[in-house]
Curated annotation (Swiss-Prot):
PANTHER family: CATALASE-PEROXIDASE, HYDROPEROXIDASE I, BIFUNCTIONAL CATALASE-PEROXIDASE. Its EC number is 1.11.1.21. This is Catalase-peroxidase. Formation of the three residue Trp-Tyr-Met cross-link is important for the catalase, but not the peroxidase activity of the enzyme. Pfam families: peroxidase. It comes from Mycobacterium ulcerans (strain Agy99). The active site is at residue 111. The gene is katG. Belongs to the peroxidase family. Peroxidase/catalase subfamily. Heme b binds at residue 274. Residues 1-15 have a biased composition (Polar residues).
Amino acid sequence: MSSDSRPPQPDTSTQSNSESESPAISSPTPQDHAPMTNRDWWPNQIDVSMLHPHPSQASPLGADFDYPKEFAKLDVDALKADVMSVMTTSQDWWPADYGHYGGLFIRMSWHAAGTYRIQDGRGGGGQGMQRFAPLNSWPDNVSLDKARRLLWPVKQKYGSEISWADLIIFAGNCALDSMGFKTFGFGFGREDVWQPEEVMWGEEDVWLGTDKRYSGKRDLAQPYGATTMGLIYVNPEGPEGKPDPVAAAHDIRETFARMAMNDEETAALIVGGHSFGKTHGAGDADLVGPEPEAAPIEQQGFGWKSSFGSGKGKDAITSGLEVVWTPTPTQWGNGFLELLYGYEWELTKSPAGAWQFTAKDGAGAGTIPDPFGGPGRAPTMLVTDISMREDPIYRRITQRWLEHPEELTEAFAKAWYKLLHRDMGPVSRYLGPWVAEPQLWQDPVPDVDHELVDAKDVAALKSKVLASGLTVAQLVKTAWSAASSFRRTDKRGGANGGRLRLEPQKSWESNEPADLDQVLSVLEGIQQDFNSSAAGGKKISLADLIVLAGSAAVEKAAKDGGHEVSVPFSPGRTDASQENTDVESFAVLEPRADGFRNYVRVGEKAPLEHLLIERAYRLGVTAPEMTVLVGGLRALGANHGGSEHGVFTDKPGVLSNDFFVNLLDMGTEWKASDAAENVYEGCDRSSGQLKWTATANDLVFGSNSVLRALAEVYAQSDAKQKFAEDFAAAWAKVMNNDRFDLE
């Protein structure tokens, strides 16, 4: 799952290369732990702490640190020159294969970026997570600790002007440049975090396990992007170590698709990445020591210390595979495909006992250079490399590239750029001089090409919206539908672009298409009237108007409740076209559930309260913000389908703290409904009369001790104004989540 069939790096070891990491290497062993934590005692409780993944107190740079501002001081050409120098300066403590660390750096970058998965946007290289557990100790990342240590002098020199997250990814891009490949571009802008996040990489309790993520014939559970716990993609020896290239192709196709790669991009990454470096399996993998997180303190974070020979250089063991893909492992060319199709292949084992293929009947013996000047070698390939020839779709693609290598060059350049940047969001977030033109997968939005509305225009537009006949609930739900598609994980979605009016979002069940169409029709009329009559070239986009209309409704609802609030509004959103919207790519943003609207897709089995926390996490809201948003949206009547679940008020449409007051009323007794699934009934404790209905999305604010503590604050008699102000602030945060231009 690591280098798998497609990493551009060959192996793991140390050198230039890189490949997967290795099923041959002993995996981390769970250690007995003590004492028991709350999570151990009550594993089914929701984890509210996940809403505060990176507290500012954890950063040594301080809450006011501005990475783009620091990066602006950086001499990027000097940085690149220094990285290039590191690549060709072999160190005795970890000698470079062929005198070049390029393959190793490619693998490092690939394995950082390649953890990205489309279903929830988690993973990727955007935060420098490879520095921390568990990624720094994954079996697939053997010896990448060496790659990062090689870069430490560069990081030390440039300090906070370059993040580790950027440097780790940039090094792989430099490696390609240094070996004669023309890259498509590069964008900086990844800001470091200072502690790991808890990410569900799988339910298995052993590394390299696969038993908990598959069902049926071989159906990989969502949201996982890898076939095996602790690997990036697939097992390079084949599924569960069975050396079957055709079966491996199935796993490759599935896992790369979950990283947003199609068949051609997948093949390009495997062929292109494996045109450099080598894998490492010089000897008995049992002689390799523990991973960094389990290594003795005196090793200072260095893991996988090997007692096989010198433990490095010609004796290196990383993946346990010993493969050199081409006769020119430090130079770009079409050698991978020329060898793949130029020989017949037979199944063999590496010196470490891992399955791989060797050119049949001794063909090509001595034609592959040894990394340290030893006798020439025979051509070798991974099981997953042979998949590029045996799978009919991959074969058709790679045979075309064999005849037209210039097409491979272009395909690899673009696929590599996508791999490194897929989790960074819109191109407006990219920094530096080498940013390529916007790509469809970046969800492009047009630049503002008109004068923006001013305060007077905003006031007039609010009045028109509120006089349009649309209700507070309709306006709030529409704005929420647009903005809440945002994911903090990969910076996708949000209101900017106005894609709520486009496929696929306008047809999502969660967005109530029929009602949405009615609201958008009215708002489009207001937009057209304004744009056709405004002076000075001023216009308002539908994206801006949707947000403005929702905010106007919030202000009205607060005023109706006796509270004056002002929701901040910053114009500048633009409207994307259907042509610049990849319907298939956007489909993964469709919510399975949205507890803020009390929506759940039919058939969803996960506990609603857990899905609510997950939704809040992706929106980037804190526990207090989640609490005030749910309570406010219930009061505003913004439930999906007009449901009354959780609407604990006799004046829906008015912004009040009634949700919390009535939820915490001990005069109400709750029980599961006999009439409806996932519904609870709140009855008067004395008379037994039904008062309210609710879902777990509502009741969790009374049952979970952390959330109840927050709910109590908003239920207090002195909290009415605070509640309205906090709701307005949290609302504005969600509306502006994708406004990176305001940061």
